[in-house]
Amino acid sequence: MSRKRIHRYFAGILALGVLGAGFSWAQAPAQPSPEYKPQFADDPARSDSEAQALGYMRVVLRAQNTYKKRHSHYAESLHALAGTGSFTKRMAQTTDRGDYTASFLYRRESPDREQFALTMTPKHLDSSHRSFFAEEDGAIHADDQKPASLDSPKVR
């Protein structure tokens, strides 16, 4: 066999191998995502993404309580809250939290009445990516049909 013929032969075998691998990969059944394993007793999360979103919310809520004890009022933004408790400056830099987007709203109605709301909105709402809502009372509400609000059921 000539050298040119050998190169064509191996190129043909390689092409068939690549095509075969491509076809078998395309026909392979999709692997179901592993079932969520609770991180602690009574974990209300339904997925790893929810666990991360709820963890972020708990950190913000604890930091707000600490901030209020130190300054006699709540932080007016996530940037102002940064460095309080375990809420880091890096956590305050972006509202993109993986599969979720965080939103923070502060409102002062009078010198002795202030409110804040924290929401975690999933990029794709479904039963394992619920939306979450919390206010200054610290209760976290969840909904898998629409954006969570004060009227949504509380998570455990």
PLM regions and their residue ranges:
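Bacterial N-terminal signal peptides that target proteins for export
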Residues: S2-G12
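Bacterial N-terminal signal peptides
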Residues: A11-A21
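Sec/Tat signal peptide C-region and signal peptidase I cleavage site
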Residues: F23-W25
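Extracellular/periplasmic head regions of type IV pilus-like filament subunits
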Residues: P29-D48, G55, V59-H129, A134, ...
